């Protein structure tokens, strides 16, 4: 039985990506799993809900998605995985919501997600990894 693994990637944080590479490779090799990589572009309302400012002169969402997909595909090349077992996805919205939606849609057998050590912001707002652990219907491996 081939498993499906979802790997959310923050394309703006290469350190987090480095942390998950060996874990993803090891899990994928167990039974030739299909690995879906997902990056999420936070929507403007999501930024506003966090009280963050944003520029009124943002590029078009299609341009942002194309650039994000290009960056994600470059990151995927760092993983030692067969190209025919890998797929890249880009979504827009709340990262935790989109990760959970994709995990359910695939359906994923496992989510492998990198996380920072908690800080005050994490305690106030919660982390994406914590939300995924609480609400995912599949196994979740959090890598710190």
Swiss-Prot record:
Any stretches that span the bilayer, and where are they?
A: none
UniProt cross-references to InterPro entries, sorted A to Z: Rossmann-like_a/b/a_fold, Universal_stress_UspA, UspA
Tell me one Pfam family matched here.
Answer: Usp
Cross-referenced NCBIfam families: PRK15005.1
Assembly information from the UniProt record: Homodimer.
What family does the Swiss-Prot or TrEMBL record give for this protein?
Belongs to the universal stress protein A family.
What's the protein name? Universal stress protein F
What is the source species?
Salmonella typhimurium (strain LT2 / SGSC1412 / ATCC 700720)
């Amino acid at each position: 039985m081939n498993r499906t693994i979802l790997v959310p990637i923050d394309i703006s944080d290469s350190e987090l990506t480095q942390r998950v590479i060996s874990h993803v490779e090891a899990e994928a090799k167990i039974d030739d799993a299909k690995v879906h990589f997902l990056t999420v572009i936070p929507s403007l309302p999501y930024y506003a809900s966090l009280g963050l400012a944003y520029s009124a002169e943002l590029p078009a969402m299609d341009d942002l998605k194309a650039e994000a997909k290009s960056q994600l595909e470059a990151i995927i090349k760092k993983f030692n995985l067969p190209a025919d077992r890998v797929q890249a996805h880009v979504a827009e919205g709340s990262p935790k919501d989109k990760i959970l939606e994709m995990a359910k849609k695939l359906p994923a057998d496992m989510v492998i997600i990198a996380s920072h050590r908690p800080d005050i912001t994490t305690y106030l707002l919660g982390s994406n990894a914590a939300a995924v652990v609480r609400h995912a219907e599949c196994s979740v491996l959090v890598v710190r």
